[in-house]
Amino acid sequence: MAGSPYVITYEGAFPLPSSPDEVWMVLQHLERFESWWGWLTEFRVDGPGLQAGSVLRGTVVPPLPYRIRVQIELLECVRPERIDAAVHGDLDGRAQLLLDPDGDGTRARVSSSIEVRQRPLRAAARLAPGLLRWGHDRVVESTVSTFRTHLRDGDER
């Protein structure tokens, strides 16, 4: 998969204003995800929540004219340190979230390697290789910004 125009490999680190325990408490509110993030629709959880074996299903709508249907299978969830996941659907690959203590806050590290499986998006990846990366990065920026707001507002309660 490496070097393929269909693969988006990502690594990012973000400071968050709350401890790893507080971050985890907010992450557990899966029922709020669709209302938090305008790019997420048709969201549902099959399973007990933020635990291994659960599957998060939804549609991602980046600021481009396409939609991506995904199923995120939680492979391992170690509170409040790590989530490992397999991504399936219009994308296929792996993703990981690490939560490291950083003073009074948290350093969230995200890594993923996902292959675009949807035919129209594969064609777009060949014609405009940076387009999918741009859409991906806008979704990540929006997610982090909104999540910081919910942490500051005390949405863990």
Please identify what each model-predicted range represents.
Residues 12-14, 45, 69-76, 94-101, ...:
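Hydrophobic/aromatic beta-strand elements that line small-molecule binding cavities or substrate pockets
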Residues 44-91, 107, 142-157:
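Glycine-rich portal/gate segments that line the openings of hydrophobic small-molecule binding cavities
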Residues 8, 18, 59, 84, ...:
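Residue-level detector of alpha-helix boundaries and kinks
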Residues 1-51, 146, 155-157:
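Hydrophobic ligand-binding cavity/cleft-lining segments
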Residues 86-141:
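Beta-strand/loop substructures that line and gate deep hydrophobic ligand-binding cavities in soluble
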Residues 17-20, 78, 102-104:
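Short loop segments at secondary-structure junctions
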